[in-house]
Curated annotation (Swiss-Prot):
Gene label: aroE
An annotated GO cellular component: cytosol
Known role: Involved in the biosynthesis of the chorismate, which leads to the biosynthesis of aromatic amino acids. Catalyzes the reversible NADPH linked reduction of 3-dehydroshikimate (DHSA) to yield shikimate (SA).
Catalytic activity: shikimate + NADP(+) = 3-dehydroshikimate + NADPH + H(+)
Record: active site: K75
This protein's record includes keyword Amino-acid biosynthesis: yes
Protein's pathway: Metabolic intermediate biosynthesis; chorismate biosynthesis; chorismate from D-erythrose 4-phosphate and phosphoenolpyruvate: step 4/7
Amino acids binding shikimate: S24, R25, S26, T71, N96, D111, Y235
Family, similarity comment: Belongs to the shikimate dehydrogenase family.
BP GO terms, sorted: amino acid biosynthetic process; aromatic amino acid family biosynthetic process; chorismate biosynthetic process; shikimate metabolic process
GO MF annotations, alphabetized: NADP binding; shikimate 3-dehydrogenase (NADP+) activity
Binding site for NADP(+): E87, G136, A137, G138, G139, A140, N160, R161, T162, A163, S164, R165, M233, G256
Identification of the protein by name: Shikimate dehydrogenase (NADP(+))
Keywords: Amino-acid biosynthesis, Aromatic amino acid biosynthesis, NADP, Oxidoreductase
Length: 295
């Protein structure tokens, strides 16, 4: 376990659990939140064995831990482990935030709300009334759907390599979409070629694994033109290949670093009841990434 602030021996203990987890930026983010708010928080990394996630979590709480963030590959296991789930977690089918309340393990998913706050607050792009294209139908896309719907876009199009998976995912959100007046459409990535320019979108979100594989999703160039925000949930020292392609097409681009900070801020608020300011923390992280890029 790696400590972010060894001087805080009496602080409330939190961790991020994953495998691997040494690369996680969560400790530095939460340490910044703690300094900013004056909260006595001690946040570490904790690597769980691939076959020992539940035992690791239970031991952490039994030893006096207050809460934990969950990263790959354990978000589905965290969903199963939680005794109580928030509406967001149930909709996402995955959990990235755990805490103990009245002796029970509670689970939430803050990824989607982190995404929409980054887009709306940090990137100054209102989602209400807009047309959104979501690339991918895996766990990242599932976690984004309900928070996106709650922002009341006019339409959400989900495009996935396997068309049936996109359709299946949308089935789970028909009721919510009806409640918020959002039109849903889903299909294969190849179906995007059949869209007319009248069906152009305002925001394109890459929630697929393509950037991890160094691949560009087959998105028609006219969907990434001037005035469009192209957003990739991935982030790194260099722009992803998707963002490079989108920028060449004329779109405004952003990676997912702000989403990382915003989902962490939501977890901090759940645990502490205090909402930290994210802008200075995001600026600090962005500067660190730029420094890495120059090395």
């Amino acid at each position: 376990m790696t400590s972010t602030d060894p001087s805080q021996a009496s602080a409330d203990r939190y961790v991020v659990i994953g495998n691997p987890v040494a690369h996680s930026r969560s400790p530095s983010i939460h340490a910044a939140f703690a300094r900013q708010t004056g909260e006595a928080v001690h946040y570490d990394r904790l690597e769980a064995p691939l076959d020992g996630f539940a035992d690791t979590v239970r031991r952490f709480f039994a030893d006096g831990g207050y809460g934990c963030n969950v990263t790959v590959p354990f978000k589905l296991e965290a969903y199963d482990l939680a005794d109580r789930l928030t509406e967001r977690a149930e909709a996402a089918g995955a959990v990235n935030t755990l805490w103990i309340e009245e002796g029970l393990i509670h689970g939430d998913n803050t990824d989607g709300i982190g995404l929409v706050r980054d887009i709306q607050d940090n990137l100054d792009t209102l989602i209400e009334g807009k047309r959104v294209l979501l690339l991918g139908a895996g766990g990242a896309a599932m976690g984004a759907m309900l928070p996106l719907i709650e922002c009341r876009p006019s339409r959400i199009v989900v495009a996935n390599r396997t068309a049936s998976r996109a359709s299946d995912m949308l089935e789970a959100f028909v009721e919510a979409a009806d409640q918020y007046g959002v039109e849903l459409w889903g299909g294969g990535l190849d179906a995007l070629e059949g869209l007319s320019e009248d069906e152009a979108v305002d925001v394109v979100i890459n929630a697929s694994s393509s950037s991890l594989q160094g691949e560009v999703p087959p998105v028609p160039e006219f969907l990434l033109g001037e005035g469009v925000l192209a957003y990739d949930m991935m982030y790194g020292a260099e722009p992803t290949v998707f963002l490079q392609f989108a920028a060449r097409c004329g779109a405004r681009v952003s990676d997912g670093l702000g989403m990382l900070v915003e989902q962490a801020a939501e977890a901090f608020y759940i645990w502490r009841g205090v909402r930290p300011r994210t802008a200075p923390v995001l600026a600090e992280l962005r500067a660190a990434l730029q420094a890495e890029r120059k090395v």
